[in-house]
């Protein structure tokens, strides 16, 4: 085994004991740590999204094993993004679009990792800035209303050139990797996960002429709302956006890195997860 492969961080999001997955996760954590040891890996556990607190541990790891669903993987990817570390998901729970393996396939995956028979996927990530506060997004950045009533006006610019005003509940700015998440629920297009582009999808726009827009990732975008709004990152973190305050979004210089099995096929995953070609009554 190469030296750089010897340390794997295990990331588990904190789970309340009343969560139906709590007991399963607790048992899985112990089993995973024992399996890593048996396969010759050093390991450590992180159960916090505070990357600064765990900076030394993060720097030490070759990769991160994310135990849970897509939400767990997204949290880990954001936390480790600035450290340029790859992650791989071991699915526990319902959603597993990003997961590399099920729990019962982890041993084979680790053996393939030791033999360099795993592929590294690099995906576009977003870098956002509000004032002096910067952040990364893996799936999407959403500009949303703070108030339940009324319409939010969002002006959109490419560089300094205005190109649209969205009037509705908000706007999704998604990555190709995130195009099958909130963007898809809002009737945005599916864009191949390895594409270099942004997807702008309006939320319940007041105008019937507004449609989702796909832009090349070479553009720098900025947005401002006519009243106070919320900026939501991957459905997990929020920032306040003051009225007429600019939100700057561009392609992150660092990619999102996911380890996947060599046999993984993007179109097969789409077909299985979205039940393409199946009867509507078929259960997942």
Curated annotation (Swiss-Prot):
Cellular component aspect of the GO annotation: cytoplasm
Top EC class for this record: transferase
Active site: 70
Positions with a binding annotation for NAD(+): 70-71, 139-140, 167, 169, 177, 180-185, 236
Keyword annotations from UniProtKB, A to Z: ATP-binding, Cytoplasm, Kinase, NAD, NADP, Nucleotide-binding, Transferase
Described function: Involved in the regulation of the intracellular balance of NAD and NADP, and is a key enzyme in the biosynthesis of NADP. Catalyzes specifically the phosphorylation on 2'-hydroxyl of the adenosine moiety of NAD to yield NADP.
Family the entry assigns: Belongs to the NAD kinase family.
Full protein name: NAD kinase
Higher taxonomy: Bacteria, Pseudomonadati, Campylobacterota, Epsilonproteobacteria, Campylobacterales
